[in-house]
Curated annotation (Swiss-Prot), chain A:
Residues 2-7, 54-69, 81-86, 127-191 are cytoplasmic. This is Cytochrome b-245 light chain. Residues 134-191 are annotated as: Disordered. It comes from Bos taurus (Bovine). Subunit of NADPH oxidase complexes that is required for the NADPH oxidase activity that generates, in various cell types, superoxide from molecular oxygen utilizing NADPH as an electron donor. Subunit of the phagocyte NADPH oxidase complex that mediates the transfer of electrons from cytosolic NADPH to O2 to produce the superoxide anion (O2(-)). In the activated complex, electrons are first transferred from NADPH to flavin adenine dinucleotide (FAD) and subsequently transferred via two heme molecules to molecular oxygen, producing superoxide through an outer-sphere reaction.
Length: 191, 633
């Protein structure tokens, strides 16, 4: 139990509660319930919560799955700095957003779900978790010819790389000037 | 490139047929219940009061009944393992259906979530309509106690309402913790919240019993000096009221009169005396049973009480007659059908959990612990009366490591008639496996290969649950099988290879293509001995083409590698780079014309998807590829 990251679960819950709030708000305003302005408020609150929670934070250990298309929102959320990084602020923000929607019947469930999400965020904040954005990895361009350090110095047939790298450890008597060992002595005089 | 219809039908056909059957069952139930509440005469007055919300809520409730009962069945793993192994399910096609049990569970779960949403929304509208359309004619029918009662009170002070709210919250917790991202990263959260399903089912049983008076009698404290007497009276009444509504009626007759309305159980009632009181009839006392959308005081006038059918001569004949009511309508709540739906699967599941608990009570005896390269530990153990088939998996539980966590591992060696030892290979990835390894192998000797038995006196107590079935058991039942393993995914195939080493003749398998892809050359040493011994055995028995091994090293840094000096048979079968699946499939198709080849994959999703696509493709040799897959997490 010691290594559970609660923030990820709180994030899923908050996103789901945002959607429930939006649905409840639509039902309330479309059905023209009494106090329908609370329905409109709940739609706005739901949209705000969804936008805030859509970019998933980075896990402290291991790789994180990104949500589809979240990099644009990550940039926006990153701009707010400590306001979005700190989970205490998020917990109280969600609690505050949830309360007004609790007075209307259609959005009561959204309130309950968002309140639970805010509680889990509080737990995550107490355990010291923080939101960190998932940075896109810089694309590694394959460099053509980057692995070729040095062109071969001998014509084929060439011995394998291990043999090529050990000229100094060979027994004395091998002619220096290249790893190629000639089976017969070669000289360039024409006799 | 064309999708071969024969292959597609063999691979996907039965699965889609079952999905279609399930879908049509749901649609049928929804439609039938919707029509019943929309048009049935026994719900006529209720429908007038509540409108569309009634039909939607009851129809979605019937779909929820079906899915809540079906969702438990794929989780009875011991039963499924039994079905897989026994001869009671002879057809391979039906056995392959069992591979999809987890997917079916998830489908039912998603359906429950969606229809719960519909059900809750419809009931919220019903609560509103109960308070707005309150009728004094039918006091029994109302859930509200007076006109314009706040619907939120209805929600929170009735048993169905309160249990419903709690169930939605439990479902919310379970659903948000079951997403793929959470399962992959924090499996614990998923596991612990998913065990709340039991709370969900208990709340569901209470929800449909709908004993409304349980809560309303708690509100009965009137004046302080009679409060104590009445409170005690109420509580004893509450306890007995479930059985003796008549008795309660006597007590409460001189108390608040609204209490008598909630005498009967259940919020939604049907009319019992249709023959003596057909809906829409005229009461000669002046009470008008039609057109409830008119204000109440207008409907008292007798001259308006003629049925509207006179103006439309082509309506049903029953409307052209003026019906006289013999008596007041009587209402009764439905028997909670949900109890019938969910009691069977719930009892089956509980029985299975009990059986598993009893079976796993005895700890195993660990024989040896071996440390392999690339963070793999092999454990060999024995247990009394433990039987397993190759390809099955077990769940390990070690209280010294963690009191609550269980982890599944595939058996790499199964007990046979001659040898009762069985074993698992564990890859050390997370904190549980790390702690487990530290308990099994003291840190000083983790570099050495095998721990002698003498030093093993202090092994921790280990309990196993299982064995449970998996699709890989089928690989011995095909004439030709292609087994593809990625990394540690080789474990189910290791048990198959161990079984073939023991005795290959009783099985239908006559040719096995074994492809193993790894990132690190040292990983091949986990089973290099087994592969070489198997290769030699088949060579000696003059069946060299029984097992065709291909090993692939997918990542290389350019230096030539070999597995080990003594594994010459494997070194010559080692390829650098990723396998080329299409060429492989073509070669297998050419060498096995007209046969059915079973394709098994235990590895990363990308390989699995490629193999699935290739299995559905056409080939000119008439070979059929049947794809079998295990889904993890």
């Amino acid at each position: 139990m010691g290594q559970i990251e609660w923030a990820m679960w709180a994030n899923e819950q908050a996103l789901a509660s945002g959607l429930i709030l939006i649905t409840g708000g639509i039902v309330a305003t479309a059905g023209q319930f009494t106090q329908w302005y609370l329905g409109a408020y709940s739609i706005a609150a739901g949209v705000l919560v969804c936008l805030l929670e859509y970019p998933r934070g980075k896990r402290s250990k291991g790789s994180t799955m990104e949500r589809c298309g979240q990099k644009y929102l990550t940039r926006v959320v990153k701009l707010f700095g400590p306001l979005t990084r700190n989970y205490y602020i998020r917990a109280f923000l969600h609690l505050g957003l949830a309360v007004p929607a609790g007075f209307l019947l259609a959005t009561i469930l959204g309130t309950a779900c968002l309140a639970i999400a805010s509680g889990i965020y509080l737990l995550a904040a107490i355990r010291g978790e923080q939101w960190s954005p998932i940075e896109p990895k810089p694309k590694e361009r394959p460099q053509i010819g980057g692995t070729i350090k040095q062109p071969p110095s001998n014509p084929p047939p060439r011995p394998p790389a291990e043999a090529r790298k050990k000229p100094s450890e060979e027994a004395a008597g091998v002619p220096t000037g290249g790893p190629q060992e000639n089976p017969m002595p070669v000289n360039d005089e024409v006799v | 490139m064309a999708v071969s219809w024969r292959s597609w039908l063999a691979n996907e056909g039965v699965k889609h047929l079952c999905l279609l059957i399930w879908l049509s069952l749901n649609v049928l139930l929804f439609w039938k219940t919707f029509l019943l509440y929309n048009q049935g005469p026994e719900y006529h007055y209720l429908h007038e009061m509540l409108g569309l919300g009634l039909c939607l809520s009851r129809a979605s409730a019937s779909v929820l009944n079906l899915n809540c009962s079906l969702i438990l069945l794929p989780m009875c793993r011991t039963l499924l393992a039994f079905l897989r192994g026994s001869q009671k399910v002879p057809s391979r096609r039906t056995r392959r259906l069992l591979d999809k049990s987890r997917t079916f569970h998830i489908t039912c779960g998603v359906t429950i979530c969606i229809f719960s949403g519909v059900h809750v929304a419809a009931h919220l509208v019903n609560a509103l309509n109960f308070s707005v359309n309150y009728r004094e004619d039918f006091v029994e029918l109302n859930a509200a106690r007076y006109r314009e009662e706040d619907p939120r009170k209805l929600l929170f002070t009735t048993v169905p309402g309160l249990t419903g709210v709690c169930m939605v919250l439990v479902l919310f917790l379970m659903f948000t913790a079951s997403t793929y991202a959470i399962r992959v990263s924090n499996y614990d959260i998923f596991w612990y919240t998913h065990n709340l399903f039991f709370v969900f089912y208990m709340l569901l049983m209470l929800h449909v019993s709908g004993s409304v008076q349980l809560l309303s009698c708690v509100q009965l404290s009137v004046t302080p000096w009679t409060a104590a007497r009445q409170a005690s009276l109420s509580i004893t009444n509450c306890l007995s009221c479930l059985h003796h509504p008549v008795v309660l009626h006597q007590y409460q007759r001189n108390e608040h009169s609204f209490f008598t309305n909630t005498m009967k159980r259940g919020l939604l009632k049907y009319q019992t005396n249709l023959d003596t009181h057909p809906p829409g009839c005229i009461n000669l006392n002046g009470t008008h049973y039609q057109n409830t959308h008119l204000p109440e005081h207008l409907s008292e006038h007798f001259h308006e009480s003629f049925p509207g059918g006179f103006s439309k001569p082509d309506e049903l004949t029953q409307n052209t007659f003026v019906k006289i009511c013999m008596e007041e309508p009587r209402f009764q709540a439905n028997f909670p059908q949900t109890w019938l739906w969910i009691s069977g699967p719930l009892c089956l599941y509980c029985a299975e959990r009990l059986y598993r608990c009893i079976r796993s009570n005895k700890p195993v005896t660990i024989i040896s612990v071996t440390s392999h390269p690339s963070d793999v530990v092999e454990i060999r153990m024995v247990k009394e009366n433990f039987k397993a088939r190759p390809g099955q998996y077990i769940i390990l539980h070690c209280p010294s490591v963690s009191a609550l966590e269980n982890h599944p591992f595939t058996l790499t060696m199964c007990p046979t008639e001659t040898k009762a030892t069985f074993g698992v290979h564990l890859k050390i990835v997370g904190d549980w496996t790390e702690r487990f390894r530290d308990l099994l192998l003291p840190p000083s000797s983790q570099d050495s290969e095998i721990l002698p038995f003498i030093q093993s006196r202090n092994y921790p107590k280990l309990y196993i649950d299982g064995p449970f079935g998996s699709p890989f058991e089928e690989s011995l039942n095909y004439e030709v099988s292609l087994c593809v393993a990625g990394g540690i995914g080789v474990t189910p195939f290791a048990s198959i290879l161990n079984t073939l080493l023991d005795d290959w003749k009783p099985y239908k398998l006559r040719r096995l293509y074994f492809i193993w892809v790894c990132r690190d050359i040292q990983s091949f040493r986990w089973f290099a001995d087994l592969l070489c011994v198997l290769y030699n055995k088949f060579w000696q028995e003059n069946r060299p083409d029984y097992v065709n091994i291909q090993l692939y090293l997918s990542q290389t840094d350019g230096i030539q590698k070999i597995i080990g000096e003594k594994y010459q048979a494997l070194n010559s079968r080692l390829f650098i780079g990723r396998p080329r699946w299409k060429l492989l499939f073509d070669e297998i198709a050419k060498c096995n014309r007209g046969k059915t080849v079973g394709v098994f994959c235990c590895g990363p999703n990308s390989i699995s998807k490629t193999l699935h696509k290739l299995s559905n493709r056409n080939n000119s040799y008439g070979t059929r590829f049947e794809y079998n897959k295990e889904s993890f997490s």
